[in-house]
């Protein structure tokens, strides 16, 4: 909140953060002009704090955009450094996607449903030793480099750059490629575990509030033959997957939803639309 105030008010003698935010906004617009796919909406996550389950909603803000854009800028600069010095790095890329046309998007109400229509067209990111464009970031090349404590690949990037600057031996491309291959499965598993963790706590939360009626936005059918639906719960700022009954909605339609059945131990969730 303090950062947002400094950016928005730019008090005399303390304009540096606002100036930096303006620079990052220009960078943000530049990426958008290059086709970056941007989703600036609240995001909810469940957290256990002192044994209590609570919803934490992260709202978009000037300070968060500044930090996010600065992190992407660093990743772009590091990628450029690697290319300039022919340095093997764990580049992240994303294949080009064919997005819905303007006419197709106009048939879907603006908001989470439009976002879902775009997201389903995007391919999974790829990590490799060769610099390639990252479609949704709107960048010609990119390397994650801001979290060497949290991500091993970021640590490898830092060690490669430090070795290059010091004139000492760097990892050759072949060895780095082997490291990336070794990391691929554990990274996929960690992402899947994180998703399953959130899905579990969603179901625990809904079990505790199963008498409540929720206003949801229908996003799409994941498996129409099984009535498996994807909906957005605005009060929780998160998407929800469950077997749905009671209506045949279209993307973007707002519905009233109740929980017909939930078993968090079995991972079962049935929704009733009205």
Task: Outline where the language-model segments fall.
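Electropositive polyanion-binding surfaces
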Residues: 1-255, 260-270
């Amino acid at each position: 909140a303090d950062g947002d105030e400094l950016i928005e008010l730019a008090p005399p003698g303390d304009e540096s953060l606002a100036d930096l935010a303006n620079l990052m906004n220009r960078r943000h617009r530049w990426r958008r002009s290059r086709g970056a796919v941007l989703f600036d909406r609240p995001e909810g996550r469940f957290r256990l704090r002192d044994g209590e389950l609570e919803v934490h909603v992260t709202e978009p803000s000037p300070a968060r955009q500044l930090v996010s854009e600065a992190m992407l800028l660093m990743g772009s600069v590091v990628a450029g450094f690697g290319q300039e010095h022919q340095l093997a790095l764990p580049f992240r890329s994303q294949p080009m996607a064919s997005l819905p046309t303007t006419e197709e998007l106009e048939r879907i109400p603006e908001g989470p449903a439009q976002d879902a229509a775009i997201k389903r067209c995007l391919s999974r990111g790829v990590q490799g030793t060769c610099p390639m464009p990252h479609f949704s970031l709107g960048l010609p090349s990119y390397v994650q480099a801001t979290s060497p404590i949290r991500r091993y690949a970021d640590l490898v990037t830092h060690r490669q750059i430090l070795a290059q600057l010091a004139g000492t031996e760097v990892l050759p491309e072949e060895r780095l490629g082997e490291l990336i291959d070794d990391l691929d499965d554990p990274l996929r598993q960690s992402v899947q575990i994180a998703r399953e963790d959130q899905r579990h706590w969603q179901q625990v939360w809904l079990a505790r509030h199963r008498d409540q009626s929720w206003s949801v936005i229908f996003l799409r059918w994941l498996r129409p033959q099984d009535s498996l639906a994807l909906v957005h719960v605005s009060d929780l700022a998160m998407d929800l997957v469950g077997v749905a009954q009671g209506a045949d909605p279209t993307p973007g339609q707002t519905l009233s939803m109740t929980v017909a059945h939930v078993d968090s131990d079995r991972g079962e969730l049935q929704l009733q639309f009205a």
